[in-house]
């Protein structure tokens, strides 16, 4: 029923047909998460890291209304050059963007949806969306969390984006029965930094241990994904108190400007990059490289 809407690249199709590991990658980080040309350079380097480690990358996006699992270098450059002119697409946006034959960059939620359609089980991303600060009044909660509760894809990330309320994000994940596994860590990472002060309930230290847990979950008939929290490398992290101070400044500026909805995350990431004089962007790039090394 959905084959008509999705195009899987030859490289990804061959890997899936031969039961070789495939790692899905989102495209919002290309269009909205980093400036050009660092966005394209980072995306291509991530793909190279995945290939060198024995897996096949599948960068996911929507081009002219077609769901795409696996992009060419030219297509990645196209998305990167357009940048924030490309629509940021979550679950709610998919029918409109596809029907109107528009081009869109996929969030964690829509990347999970398209990955599952394509038969891809592993997805690496910098940080998931979550419960925003002040959500008790704004009700601003990312659709990424609901997707994790319903879609059978493993998401490997450096925790949730540090601009969020991480404590409430973990509470939401618990409420919806989403397993959170700390990969080599007892503490939930906070994107730019390895620490958040928030413990993870389950720690895994090897790929085999992690794979067995994921396999068991789905064999038990428990639908939904798994969040694997793989912290940023120690040498690449930003100092905890400093980055939190910069985040609070950026959040205050966003509130003063009345920025909200899907515009809030790209605005905050760009403002934090400005306030940290590029330090946050360097950390973001390094954590994405690190995440690309895990294949289950």
Question: Where are these predicted regions, by residue range?
Answer:
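Solvent-exposed alpha-helices and their adjacent loops that cap or buttress functional pockets
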Residues: 14-17, 22-23, 52, 113-117, ...
């Amino acid at each position: 029923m959905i084959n008509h809407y999705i195009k899987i690249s030859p490289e990804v199709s061959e890997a899936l047909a031969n039961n070789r590991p495939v790692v899905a990658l989102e495209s919002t980080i290309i269009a909205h998460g980093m400036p050009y040309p660092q966005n394209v350079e980072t995306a291509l380097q991530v793909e190279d890291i995945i290939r060198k480690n024995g897996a096949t990358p599948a960068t996911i996006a929507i081009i002219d209304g077609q769901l795409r699992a696996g992009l060419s270098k030219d297509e990645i450059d196209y998305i990167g050059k357009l940048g924030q002119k490309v629509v940021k697409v979550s679950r709610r946006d998919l029918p409109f963007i596809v029907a109107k034959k528009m081009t869109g960059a996929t969030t964690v939620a829509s990347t999970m949806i398209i990955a599952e359609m394509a038969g891809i089980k592993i997805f690496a991303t910098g940080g998931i969306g979550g419960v925003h600060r002040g959500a008790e009044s704004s009700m601003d909660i990312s659709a990424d969390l609901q997707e994790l509760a319903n879609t059978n894809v493993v998401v490997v990330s450096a925790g949730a984006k540090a601009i969020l309320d991480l404590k409430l994000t973990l509470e939401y994940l618990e409420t919806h029965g989403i397993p959170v596994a700390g990969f080599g860590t007892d503490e939930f990472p906070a994107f730019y930094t390895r620490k958040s002060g928030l413990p993870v309930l389950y720690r895994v230290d090897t790929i085999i241990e992690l794979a067995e847990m994921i396999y068991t979950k789905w064999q038990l008939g428990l639908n939904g994904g798994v969040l694997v929290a793989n912290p940023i490398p120690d040498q690449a992290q930003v100092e905890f108190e400093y980055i939190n101070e910069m985040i609070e400044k950026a959040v205050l500026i966003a509130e003063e400007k009345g920025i909200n909805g899907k515009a809030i995350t790209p605005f905050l990431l760009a403002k934090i990059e400005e306030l940290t004089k590029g330090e946050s962007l360097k950390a973001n790039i390094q954590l994405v490289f690190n995440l690309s090394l895990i294949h289950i």
